[in-house]
Amino acid sequence: MVVANDLSSKILPRVLIVSRRTLRKNKYVDFVGEYHLDLIVSSGAVPVIVPRVNGIHSMLQSFEPIHGVLLCEGEDVDPSLYADDELSDLSPEDMEEIKKAHAEDMTIDREKDSIELTLARLCLERNIPFLGICRGSQILNVAAGGTLYQDIDKELGTTMTTTNHIDYDNYDGHRHEARIVEETPLHKLFEEMEIMVNSYHHQGVKRLAQRFVPMAYAPDGLIEGFYDPNRYDPKEGQFLMGLQFHPERMRLPGSDEFDYPGCALVYQEFVKAVIAFQKKQVNATQVEMKRKTTTLVKSFSQAEFLEANTVLSKQQENRLKQMGATVRNSCVYMKRMKMKEEQERAMDKLSAERLSDMLSFHHMMARLCSNAIKRKLLEPEHTDRTIESSFFLNY
C-alpha cells in the first residue's frame, strides 16, 4: 500500500473507470462502486471516471494520457456484438423466462457497450494495462473476439454439476467455489487451489478469445478468470486480466478485511503495471523530446557540441560567437533582400527614358572610379598593395 504523504510530490498514473447509470428520483445518476476506487487510490493511482453519457465514446481521446483501464459491473453486453457467428439455442420462451428472472440486468446499454469496447480495444492495441471485473471481463473477451453465454442456467445448466452464480437476496454474502489453475497469476496471488468467490451474473464466457488462457473454473465448467500470458508482467507495465467474480466484495462479515490477501493483491499488481506503464510512456516522451531537440540543435549552424550543464571550451565559445554572427548576418541579408525587392518594385515604376539616364550616369561613375583607382596605384605607397588593388580593378 502506498503512503499518502509519498504521493503528494508525484504525478500519479491515471486509471480510467466507466461509470454505471441508475435511475434515482426520476433522474439518471452515474456512479462507480467505492470499493474499486479505494483499492485503486490505496495502490497508488488516480481513478478517472468516464461518465456514461451519450456521445462520450467519440471523445475518449480527450481522456489521454491513459495509463490503465478498469472495467467493472453493469448490465448485459448486447448479444449482437458477439453472437452473429453463433446460433443461439435459446427459444423465444427461454428469452421471456430470462427477462423475468433478470429484468434489470437485461436492459441493454449500447452507449456503455460502445465506450467500454472502445477502451478495451485501445488497451489491446496499445498494450495498456487492463483489469476487467464481472462485466468488464466479458467486455474484454468480446473485444478480443470471444463470445458469451446469454444465460448460464439455460445454456450451461444442463451439465451434471450446477453452480449458483447469483443470489439477488444476498449480493455480498453469496459465495461459490472456484478452482484455480496452477502456475497462473491467480494461483500466485491467492496461493490456493480452491477459493470461495463472490459473484452475481447470469452471463459468462462461452468461447474464450484465442489469446487468453483460463485461470479458474466454477464447478459447472464456467471460466471464472483468464489472462493473456504474453501480456502479463506487472513490473514491465504489462497486465491483461479478466475476473468473472468480485474480489473487491469478498470481505469478512461486518469487516473491511478480505477473505483472502489475494483479493487486494489483484488491484495492487494491476496498479504496479499501471505505474510501470506510465514510467515507460514518460521515458519514451523524454527520449522523443531529446531526439527532436538534438535534431534542432544540429540543424542550427552544426552546433552538435551543445549539451546542458556543460562547461564550454574556448573553441566551443568561439563557435557560439560564430553562430551569433551567422544569425546576425542572416538578419542583415534578409533586410537587404527586402530592400532589393522594394528597389526593384520602385524601378519598375520608372519610365524607360528615366532608366536610360540612370544607366548612363552609373556607367560614367564607373569610369571615373576606375581612373581614380589607376592613378592611386601609380603612387609609391601603393606599390606593395598591387595584388589587393587588382582585385578591385577586376571587380
UniProtKB/Swiss-Prot annotation:
InterPro entries reported in the protein's UniProt record: Class_I_gatase-like, Peptidase_C26, PuuD-like
Disulfide linkage: none
Catalytic activity, EC: 2.4.2.-
Pfam family, any one: Peptidase_C26
One function term, GO molecular function aspect: hydrolase activity, acting on carbon-nitrogen (but not peptide) bonds, in linear amides
Keyword Magnesium assigned: no
Protein task: Putative glutamine amidotransferase that represses shoot branching. May act as a factor that links nitrogen stress response and branching control. May activate strigolactones by amidation, or represent a new pathway for repression of shoot branching.
PANTHER family with a match to the protein in the record: GLUTAMINE AMIDOTRANSFERASE GAT1_2.1-RELATED (PTHR43235:SF8), GLUTAMINE AMIDOTRANSFERASE PB2B2.05-RELATED (PTHR43235)
Protein's name according to its UniProt entry: Putative glutamine amidotransferase GAT1_2.1
Native species: Arabidopsis thaliana
The encoding gene: GAT1_2.1
